[in-house]
Amino acid sequence: MVKSSNIAIHSHVRSLGLDDCGNPVEKPDAVIGQENAREAAGLIVEMVRTKRMSGRAVLISGPVGSGKTALAVGISEELGAGTPFTSMSGSEVYSNEVKKTEVLEEALRRSILVRMRELKDVYEGEVVELRIVDEENPLSSYPKRIKEMFVILKTSKESKKLKLAPSLYEQIDKQRIVNGDVVYIEVNSGVIKKLGRSEAHMNDFDLEADTYVPIPKGEVLKRKEVMQSVTLHDLDMANARPSGQDMLSLVFRILSPRKTEITERLRGDVNRMVNGYLENGNAEIVPGVLFIDEVHMLDVECFTFLHKVIESPLSPTIIFASNKGMAPIKGSDGLLGPFGITKDLLDRIVIISVKRNPDEANREIIRRRMKEEGLEMDDDAFGFFVGLSTSRSLRYCISLIPLLKTYGGCVSVRNVEEVAELFHDS
């Protein structure tokens, strides 16, 4: 079965398009045009990587369709998966269930990663024998109940027989662990992880394509250093709501469908726990990036909160985006401000200006979007299509690409004219 996936509007952007010295260069998967803005964004990326940008704010300003979000996506791609990047819109803070500042606080803590280093006792080896003993369930005739489990693990040095708790059967069954698999069992938590198939069974006939791994060396019981990466918000949620499988926990989740609001006291407990790991040298903080699009949708209360956050020592880099000039500040009784932002917050922000794309840049953007979505078009149709981006808008043209794909094959001028007549620009 072929899996289909939606193509995101900025899926063609995979980098900022900078060389090793930070100068803008043309790349087939980079942000198009906007050389000065790309160079400025490269400096932001470098400062985030070296943890010198924490607790600072940047505003990307420019007209509609000029590439503000594309620039933010380029920053995210340059930072990579190791640095958290959270994206939200200014209108997302308004809710009947949760306070505006709570939504912002949650997004901020999603953007801060904690890498915790922990020493764990683990059993690791190849499964030589797996024996499951079941018994009749006294409450019903079906299904049978797991009474006990035994497993023999082998390394290059020794073998060891282990007795496992019946509650671990679900993990074994879910991962389809059988003889010949190399597994990893944590002593304290009871987590079982299948690492792969032993290389000793590479020549066996098997319908499933397994990953083959060497037989572990040394003793079966060993102490390993495990790195775990979680955000502060993940730690908050783990402490805020029960995650057990008992009946009381399930009933609590059914009766509490509302979004859980995390208290300041709980966040303080999480911060103290993380600080303890930091003082012992068992953890490190990785400040990430929070991107807030349409920042002019926030109100005075949100701006005051963000102003305080920027001054705090534990804060990610905040990137705003706005297409407004002088605009009313929400919640201020009609007071005007640049980009709809209060002056106190604006004084602490550095601004990256994005200009309207020239026709040649629009032509290249449309070409890449067509390639990304697999649309073919003859030269006359392409010239006419690019002309629509000038007479109407670039966003309008990009929104027509999925519609033109319904014609199949190579799209002609007549096809473009038909779609343009049916669907109008705002």
Curated annotation (Swiss-Prot):
Protein's name in the database: RuvB-like protein 1
Top-level taxon of the source organism: Eukaryota
Task performed by this protein: DNA helicase which participates in several chromatin remodeling complexes, including the SWR1 and the INO80 complexes. The SWR1 complex mediates the ATP-dependent exchange of histone H2A for the H2A variant HZT1 leading to transcriptional regulation of selected genes by chromatin remodeling. The INO80 complex remodels chromatin by shifting nucleosomes and is involved in DNA repair. Also involved in pre-rRNA processing.
Residues involved in ATP binding: G62, P63, V64, G65, S66, G67, K68, T69
Subcellular location: Nucleus
EC number: 3.6.4.12
Subunit structure: Component of the SWR1 chromatin remodeling complex, the INO80 chromatin remodeling complex, and of the R2TP complex.
Species whose genome carries this gene: Encephalitozoon cuniculi (strain GB-M1)
Catalysed reactions, as listed in the record: ATP + H2O = ADP + phosphate + H(+)
Cleaved signal peptide residues: none
Family: Belongs to the RuvB family.
Subcellular location, principal: nucleus
Keywords, ordered alphabetically: Activator, ATP-binding, Chromatin regulator, DNA damage, DNA repair, Helicase, Hydrolase, Nucleotide-binding, Nucleus, Transcription, Transcription regulation
A GO CC term attached to the entry: nucleus
Gene that this sequence comes from: RVB1
GO MF, one example: ATP hydrolysis activity
Listed GO biological process terms: chromatin organization; DNA repair
